[in-house]
Amino acid sequence: CQLLYEILLNQKADVKLVGNIGNPILSVKRVNKKTIFVIEASSYQLEYSKIFKSKYAAILNISPDHIERHKTLKRYIKAKFKLLKNQSKGNFAFVKKNDFLISKELKANRLNSKVIKINTKKNNKLIENTKNKYFLTETNKENFLFAFEISKILKLKHRLIEETIHRFNGLEFRQQIIFKRKFLTIINDSKSTSFSSSIGVLKSNQNIYWLLGGIPK
């Protein structure tokens, strides 16, 4: 969400970043017909949502999470997929092509929106050419591919997308390098609250000492 927001901001769009990222949707006061909302919608919010509909919706992955809330994986997936099931004709649903649970759910549900499956294993020239080390990890590369595909549908200027990619710093506490010496790099990834969100940075590093904490979900 943060990356897409910054891409749109660099395109001089009237854009608001809201939702689970920390800014309540209802706190936004000045909006017009051209205002674009980039919303991070959690399964908690979607669970009781009946009418929320987004023209462009994305599910990057699905893995067991928030089971203490939803009780079963099936109910968790049902809440997440409301994001796509509430869409109508002319809307766009962006999903990870090589995700087993997403593929299974797509077969079980007929969606009204146009489904765009993103192959996260495919190389992208913009990523290959960037000197921004933030996008070297698997997770951040996937985030970029989703933001890039949405940007293409929105017909955003490629040059400005490239500008944003080169200078993007990411989120605080998300794969944030807080110390680096010759043989030691300390990474703060405390914003990752599940194994599926941590696996990208683990795959991108070697000789790891992984410190975990928090409440089991």
Task: Write out the residue ranges for each language-model feature.
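A conserved segment at the C-terminal end of the G1
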Residues: 1-16
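A conditional alpha-helix N-cap/helix-loop micro-motif detector
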Residues: 18, 73-77, 191, 217
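Flexible active-site lid/hinge loop adjacent to a nucleotide/diphosphate
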Residues: 21, 25, 31-135
